[in-house]
Design a protein with these regions (language model features):
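N-terminal secretory signal peptides that target proteins for export/translocation
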Residues: 1-10
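Beta-strand-rich domain onsets/edges
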Residues: 30-50, 57
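Extracellular beta-sheet/turn segments enriched in Thr/Pro/Gly and aliphatic residues
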Residues: 35-43, 114-135
Length: 538
């Protein structure tokens, strides 16, 4: 390139940039096709506050967990109704550019690659920003924690919950368990954060709520769930549901909550508990029963620490096999069963594992048992440990199992040559699809290592789950211990709801989303959505 050519190119570039910058300074959109300015209307916003609301471009519904950031780094996150109550004295009545981003949603970029919109915030006015949902599942609301409808309250709106700022004094809450018991939904969570001190409750928190009526629009969980927490009468903060006061060392986790009859035929609320030093090391484990008079769980049977599978786990389901009723355990794939009575649940000798292993190496399956046709020989038995998604993935990697024979390690519907390793989730019967549907967290996923959620189907609860469709994605945030609640299903099972723990833990991302971090977020999914066709079992 000659010097003349270089000078011409340099001047042309400067001229183009100058025109674009001048157009921006005058309030024009720099490149055709970029997002328009926010729609402004007079509305309910009152006092000193300007209302900025982010809405789904398809449904018109407010979108929670949307981050708006100004050029100078001020960040705002929408509440459960998709609202931000805005009052920055130096920015009112002035045009402000907000970068807009949200997990599983997108905002079109302008000519410079900025995904955002210009807003002129004025007290008493509403600015609507439209965003496009890319997730198959729709994010509805944050279920736990403080300030659920914080911005809506400031703006004078009436939220759908009796306590819109967060019941139970809870700041953060981890990993849900739920069961219908005595005409209520009983909810239990793991570690629970409080606002009054960095150390929270580490001995199980609990709450109840009415059983929702699928035909009653008022019981639609889209706006949240009206939890009635079990609280300490003095502090009003969530109290311990499994105190174990005589054994104060360690934290207590409660999992696999379900109901079964005892020897008198009385329904009992049961769960597996562990008292632990950390994520891996346990002090003790066992089966716990709910004491209705004390309203706490108490140990009913302690299990040997070396016992890894002859116990409840995951989100239990009931099913029939050959006319015999069973209780199934496993997360996300059901691979352990026991007769559904309290007496059987308390007896490790009554548990059976679903396996295709030839032998065990320690407490893990060693290699697959293949028949004369080269297919794995699956069976229920009492001696060998169960096979799960992680085991199948290892066998696939080692060439010991053919991809078409995988049962718990489905193909990625978008890239069938790749297999999806499932970490936690649930399998439920779906009356609309007339299939067992799996909603589970993927591990070793992208763009988030543990924040991608998958949907798959099977004719049996134990699979095979052939293809999995991504229904939720996160940008370097984690979404784990996913659970689909069948009692929240609507429209005959066409609409299902699931939740999970949203956090920056295990993501490699140091940024914590204010109020949302380490809390439960609810999604709904239309199982008839065209995007799920690749996962359907015909």
């Amino acid at each position: 390139m000659t010097r003349v050519h270089r000078d011409f190119c340099r001047k042309a570039t400067l001229f183009t940039a100058t025109v674009l910058l001048l157009s921006i300074s005058r309030g024009a959109t720099p490149i055709s096709g970029a997002d328009d300015d926010a729609d402004r209307t007079s509305g309910r916003a009152g006092g000193i506050w300007a209302e900025i609301r982010v809405i789904d471009s398809d449904t018109g519904r407010g979108v929670p967990l949307v981050e708006l950031e100004t050029v100078n780094g001020l960040k705002f996150v929408t509440d459960n109704a998709g609202r931000v109550a805005f009052h920055e004295p130096g920015l009112m009545g002035r045009e402000v550019f907000f970068t807009v981003k949200s997990h599983g949603c997108e905002m079109r970029k302008d000519g410079f690659g900025f995904a955002g919109v210009r807003v002129t915030p004025r007290a008493g006015e509403i600015s609507n920003i439209k965003i496009k949902r890319k997730n198959v599942a729709e994010r509805l609301c944050r279920l736990t924690g403080e300030g659920l409808y914080r911005d809506s309250v400031l703006l004078g709106h009436k939220p759908p919950l009796p306590d819109p700022l967060g019941p139970g004094g809870v700041a953060g809450q981890d990993s849900v368990q739920a069961a219908i018991y005595r005409d209520k939904v009983y909810w239990f969570w793991g570690d629970t954060l409080r606002m009054s001190y960095p150390l929270g409750l580490f001995r199980v928190a609990g709450a109840t709520s009415p059983i929702p009526d699928a035909k009653d629009p008022k019981s639609d969980p889209a706006g949240g769930i009206a939890y009635e927490y079990f609280v300490d009468p003095k502090s009003k903060f969530a109290r311990a549901m499994m105190p174990l006061a005589e054994r104060p060392e360690g934290v207590v986790w409660l999992e696999a909550v379900f109901t079964v009859p005892d020897q008198r035929g009385v329904e009992r609320l049961v769960g597996w508990y562990s008292r632990r030093k950390g994520l891996e090391e346990m002090y003790e484990q066992g089966i716990a029963l709910f004491d209705d008079a004390k309203e706490v769980f108490e140990p009913a049977k302690q299990l040997a620490l070396r016992e890894t599978w002859r116990r409840p786990s995951g989100h239990p389901i009931f099913y029939e096999d050959g006319g015999t009723r069973w209780l199934l355990f496993g997360s996300p794939n059901p691979n352990v069963r026991v007769p559904p009575t309290l007496q059987d649940v308390l007896d490790p000798a009554r548990y059976e594992a679903f396996t295709c292993a030839k032998a065990a190496k320690g407490e893990k399956p060693a290699e697959p048992d293949l028949g004369a046709d080269g297919k794995p020989v699956w069976r229920w038995q009492k001696d060998l440990p169960p096979v799960d998604s992680k085991t199948e993935q290892q066998w696939l990697k080692e060439g010991k199992l053919k991809p078409e024979h995988a049962r718990f390690c489905p193909a990625d519907a978008a890239a069938p040559a790749d297999r999806v390793i499932l970490h936690s989730g649930s399998v439920r019967w779906n009356a609309y699809r007339k299939r067992w549907v799996l909603v589970a967290q993927q591990t070793f996923g992208k763009p988030s290592f543990s924040g991608e959620v998958r949907y798959a189907e099977a004719e049996h609860p134990t699979g095979p789950f052939g293809r999995a469709v991504r229904i939720v994605t996160h940008d370097r945030q984690t979404f784990y211990n996913v659970c689909h609640h069948p009692f929240l299903d609507r429209d005959g099972g066409r609409i299902i709801h699931f939740e999970g723990t949203y956090t920056n833990e295990f993501s490699g991302n140091p940024e914590k989303t204010p109020r949302y971090n380490y809390n439960q977020i609810l999604y709904r999914l239309d199982v008839d959505a065209p995007a799920l066709r690749a996962a359907r079992v015909k």
